[in-house]
Swiss-Prot record:
Family (UniProt): Belongs to the glycosyl hydrolase 45 (cellulase K) family.
Catalytic residue list: 10, 121
InterPro entries: GH45_Enzymes, Glyco_hydro_45, RlpA-like_sf
Lineage: Eukaryota, Fungi, Dikarya, Ascomycota, Pezizomycotina
One GO biological process term: cellulose catabolic process
Listed name of the protein: Endoglucanase-5
Length: 213
């Protein structure tokens, strides 16, 4: 199938971090304001008043080599719903912009309330907070536009240390691509992604495995 991408990092608890969203072994990990994992899956999101649960800093993208990356996204898949995509993994092959031909495997950790069909909102710190801003209550906020985020690599230097690598990734591996299109297919989740979210779908074995370079 063909899809389109945007980018965001709102610091909020991932929507797949709540119990009973999907047939999975456990919900996606959330973290406290200091980016430490919390074990209470019922903890209120930091994007709500009095909330304590935020996105974990390791649920951000990284390069495996020049042509292959791993990461996470909020998704909205045509003909499916949150029960169908929470913690599912997808192999994206970019088809436009400076990343055309590169591949990325992402795990769905959230659902974009403002997303269209076959839309992947890639988790990229500094990509813009979008509708919700959990970054301001978490650590005082991030620079950049609400939609689209920052515009230059050196702005990443002002980020919390834990979020810098994912911010730099956008300007390095991702070549500051602006919402590139891609083709995608569902695949088995690589262990490298599950290690960061803790979440694997019960039906994960039904999908083709991906060779990580």
């Amino acid at each position: 199938a063909d899809g389109r991408s945007t980018r965001y990092w709102d610091c909020c608890k991932p929507s797949c971090g709540w119990a009973k969203k999907a047939p999975v072994n456990q919900p996606v990990f959330s973290c406290n304001a200091n980016f430490q994992r919390i074990t209470d899956f019922d903890a209120k999101s930091g994007c709500e008043p009095g909330g304590v649960a935020y996105s974990c800093a390791d649920q951000t993208p990284w390069a495996v080599n020049d042509d292959f990356a791993l990461g996470f996204a909020a998704t909205s898949i045509a003909g499916s719903n949150e029960a169908g995509w929470c913690c599912a993994c997808y192999e994206l092959t970019f088809t436009s912009g400076p990343v055309a031909g590169k591949k990325m495997v992402v795990q769905s950790t959230s659902t974009g309330g403002d997303l269209g069909s076959n839309h992947f909102d890639l988790n990229i710190p500094g990509g813009g907070v979008g509708i919700f801003d959990g970054c301001t209550p978490q650590f005082g906020g991030l620079p950049g536009q609400r939609y689209g985020g920052i515009s230059s690599r050196n702005e990443c230097d002002r980020f919390p240390d834990a979020l810098k690598p994912g911010c730099y990734w956008r300007f390095d591996w991702f070549k500051n691509a602006d919402n590139p299109s891609f083709s995608f297919r569902q695949v088995q989740c690589p262990a490298e992604l599950v290690a960061r979210t803790g979440c694997r779908r019960n039906d994960d074995g039904n999908f083709p495995a991906v060779q990580i370079p």
